[in-house]
């Protein structure tokens, strides 16, 4: 299964992430965001970051998850290439781990910096056992 794909969007980047579970789709979404910024296959898992979020709904939970990861890039230049997520739908909470390392210009390709997550065109759906997350990030 393809984990994610990009779609054209004026001045920003659209992402469609897939997963066999909601958690896997959230992990794919995070991977796609960091793939916009660098080649994630070059990221070593030297640092582990734990993230806990509470959302008002699934869209808000996705927004908070991606935005939290971007804060680590903005503040510490951390790039992530592996993620583990668990979601409690009853309490609308997310517990996640992100694995990666600090950006190194000699090792990591510098692509487009993602400035922020948005709600623009956000859609979370399920089709034939596949969860689909569609959203746009600001670049």
UniProtKB/Swiss-Prot annotation:
Entry keyword annotation includes Lipid biosynthesis: no
Gene3D superfamilies: Archease domain
Example GO BP: tRNA splicing, via endonucleolytic cleavage and ligation
Keywords per UniProt: Calcium, Metal-binding, tRNA processing
UniProt GO molecular function: calcium ion binding
Residues engaged in binding Ca(2+): 12, 138-139
Signal peptide: none
Entry keyword Disulfide bond: no
Family: Belongs to the archease family.
Function: Activates the tRNA-splicing ligase complex by facilitating the enzymatic turnover of catalytic subunit RtcB. Acts by promoting the guanylylation of RtcB, a key intermediate step in tRNA ligation. Can also alter the NTP specificity of RtcB such that ATP, dGTP or ITP is used efficiently.
PANTHER family: ARCHEASE, PROTEIN ARCHEASE
Protein name: Protein archease
Organism, as annotated: Sulfolobus acidocaldarius (strain ATCC 33909 / DSM 639 / JCM 8929 / NBRC 15157 / NCIMB 11770)
């Amino acid at each position: 299964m393809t984990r994610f794909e990009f779609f054209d969007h004026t001045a920003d980047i659209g992402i469609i992430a897939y997963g066999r579970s909601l958690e896997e789709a959230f992990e794919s979404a995070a991977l796609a965001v960091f793939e916009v910024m660098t080649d994630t296959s070059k990221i070593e898992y030297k640092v582990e970051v734990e993230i806990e979020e509470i959302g008002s709904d699934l869209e808000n939970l996705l927004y908070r998850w991606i935005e939290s990861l971007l804060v680590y890039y903005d503040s510490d230049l951390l790039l992530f290439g592996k993620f583990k997520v668990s979601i409690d739908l009853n309490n609308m909470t997310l517990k996640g781990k992100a694995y990666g390392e600090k950006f190194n210009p000699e090792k990591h390709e510098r692509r487009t910096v993602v400035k922020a997550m948005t709600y623009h065109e956000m859609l979370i759906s399920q089709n034939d056992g596949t969860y689909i997350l569609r959203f746009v990030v600001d670049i």
